């Protein structure tokens, strides 16, 4: 009888998702899901917050925007912090800061205090998921990276769907304060488990913070995202405030790239883009993030403004996307480990294209099965593309490069989502004005108009949404180019 060689046996063990790896992934998911939920859970409560604090929607929107800005700004610190202090220690500290921000947000006494505490939440939350991904990438190794990334990607795709559902239910049943307090028991459980189960990582005490690169990159990202959000809210590219912010942000990021190429240990190693796997994965994530995550922010507005759905009903209408993603992710992860990202991701992009095409034809009275089926297809496409392409980003990288690669790819994803939201909001605003030339209000006024003129306004608004989704379709199709250049197989 032939005996399996120790080498082959070891290789087989390296491909198996052991209980230790699965437990580690569960802890990371538990901590990460709250931070992603909080990017969307507050959206359904903005009107209530505006009434309670007697302030305008233009002011109260910063409760949502400041979290995103703080979240994106600290991601570049992840690589340095994990190397300087150890990933486990920084993960626990970040979770503790996020929980403190949640507690204080729930106790907020004014709109100013709530915005400040949401910023604290974002600073803590921004590092949790990329740190967890780096820990898992190092523990899993190249033979299991696709399946592990699919597991940890669950909160990224499911939380934005269930966030509005949970938020709407909590606001209706209790109070807006509970959308923040709900994080505390989950966070406490994640903290206790992580303190016991996350592996200790040797800190590199000699690592120094890139003090010159920090304000350039973090400040540039913050200014750029702020400018884009202002373009979306003001509906004008030429307005001085967003224009200066966007151009200033681009200038700071450009200066950072120049600095990083001349520094031994920059905050984000831009030399990673010289690796084909990382560069193509980053480009794929950027295009899909702009198109699909931006679109998924606008779809709830379509349901509420055009079809008159409540916040809770809207959250439930978005569930098919989450189901599609949940079904596709484990299958795509297993296939990626076997045949490589290049064979999986383009197929996922094509499935997403089918769903987006359906929404370009959307009407005010489109049947529910049509909308649900299209969302399910978009979810399948997202589940088969985002995390497999993230796994491909590690191809060709050394063990030591993985933490910095993780922070870079996560920053790209968050920026892409912000960029997509702002750009599609501008397209939507202009499309609405094209359909309704006498309309000069915002999206809230658009909803009131649909209620006042149910015979004509909903159809015109639905047409504006369809026009906007054509823009998303173009970006989704364009993502096929870098997707077809992804690595064929993970290295052995």
Locate predicted features.
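Flexible interhelical linker loops that connect adjacent transmembrane helices
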Residues: 13-16, 22, 143, 191-218, ...
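Interfacial helix-cap and linker-helix signal at transmembrane-aqueous boundaries
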Residues: 49-50, 81-82, 166-174, 228, ...
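C-terminal module of multi-pass small-molecule transporters
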Residues: 77-79, 83-96, 104, 109-113, ...
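C-terminal membrane-cytosol helix-exit motif in multi-pass small-molecule transporters
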Residues: 185-202, 219-230, 248-262, 480-487
